A protein has these predicted regions:
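N-terminal secretory signal peptides and thylakoid transit peptides that target proteins
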Residues: 1-14
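C-terminal motif of bacterial Sec signal peptides marking the signal peptidase cleavage site
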Residues: 19-20
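Bilobed "Venus flytrap"/periplasmic-binding protein-like clamshell domains
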Residues: 27-59, 64, 126-198, 202, ...
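An extracytoplasmic/periplasmic, membrane-proximal ligand-sensing/linker region
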Residues: 39, 165-167, 171-172, 177-179, ...
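Acidic helix-start/capping segments at beta-turn-to-alpha-helix junctions
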Residues: 62-78, 86-91
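Alpha-to-beta junction loops
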Residues: 75-84, 156-158, 201-210
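Ligand-binding "clamshell"
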Residues: 93-103, 107-122, 202-204, 216-230
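A bilobed periplasmic-binding-protein/Venus flytrap-type ligand-binding module shared by bacterial periplasmic
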Residues: 131-141, 236-249
Length: 295
């Protein structure tokens, strides 16, 4: 692990201290976008700051919206790259059946994006930000729920606090209902991302949607329900880049591939704590993350 980290730091250091060899005079700025939640915004800010350190001009277009909105912006050419999750791309964008081998999933997504959209998936990070459902210790004991199978059966007695995408995405509630059966909740209410945890803590819900790198899980000692039938695939994050941007700025690949190994589960949980709980600005958290690792 230390050898890998040292090698990653060396690679990133060499990438980030490149002179302006990639910044062609008059080249259009690379437009870096993100989806509309703290983790994606923060990682996009890390990508943007790393590119700027390598003298690649950057324009930020953060907080665009859902997966569909970000992908539409890529297809129109409104943005040149953004962070995406392998499982989300496979199921929600490509509408393909889940794959549970993370490497096979990445290769499938990489090939399909190249063929369908003329977009390149760069190196994925080890962080796996899977979807999930969580509850409080009290509710888990009261209803005897520790797994998704338990929750599927108990759902008619439970109120769900969900982010808006969860009620419609194929890899979310509709998929759970089809795959596990059940999951017919007593009540479903949608909240802005992050506020589902507030509803859970205030007793306005019994179960909430979660991402496994969310800092609120540890802060509030929540119970993440085990995916005992293995519904969800891997959700490794990687930069998705329009081929036209790579042709204009080929050094993007080296810069962002050097970042990839540093985005581990623990590193991303720490970033999420800083941004989503301690309310740091994502750009500030990103700059501190890079400074800590290559200075």
């Amino acid at each position: 692990m230390n050898i890998t980290r040292a090698r990653s730091l060396a690679l990133m250091g060499s990438a980030l201290i490149l002179p302006s060899c990639g910044g062609k005079g008059g080249s259009r700025a690379v437009r870096v976008g993100s989806k509309n939640f703290g983790e994606d915004i923060t990682i996009a800010e890390i990508y943007a700051a790393a590119l700027e350190h390598s003298n690649i001009p950057v324009e930020r277009r953060m907080n665009l919206g859902s997966t569909q909105i970000a992908m539409a912006a890529m297809q129109r050419g409104d943005i040149d790259l953004y962070p995406e999750y392998t499982g989300t791309a496979l199921i929600d964008v490509l509408h393909m059946a889940p794959l549970h081998d993370a490497k096979q999933l990445y290769q499938r997504v990489r090939m399909q994006y190249q063929e369908r959209y003329g977009m390149t998936w760069l190196q994925p990070s080890p962080v796996n930000d899977s979807q999930g459902l969580c509850t409080t210790q009290t509710v888990a004991r009261k209803y005897g729920i520790r797994t998704l199978s338990d929750c599927a059966k108990a759902a008619p007695q439970l109120r769900l606090a969900a982010i808006p995408e969860f009620v419609a995405r194929a890899d979310a509630l509709p998929g759970l209902q089809k795959f596990y059966g059940g999951f017919r909740f007593k009540d479903v209410k949608t909240y802005e991302i992050g506020l589902q945890y507030t509803a859970l803590q205030h007793g306005d819900a019994d179960v909430a949607t979660a991402f496994t790198t969310d800092a609120q899980i540890a802060v509030n000692t929540l119970v993440v329900l085990r995916d005992d039938k293995h519904f969800w695939p891997a959700y490794n994050i990687a930069p998705v880049v329009r081929n036209a941007a790579l042709r204009a700025h080929p050094q993007i690949t080296g810069v962002l591939n050097a970042i990839a190994p540093l985005l581990t589960d623990s590193a991303v949980r720490r970033l999420n704590l800083q941004v989503n709980v301690q309310h740091q600005d994502p750009a500030d958290a990103a700059q501190a993350f890079l400074k800590e690792r290559y200075n």
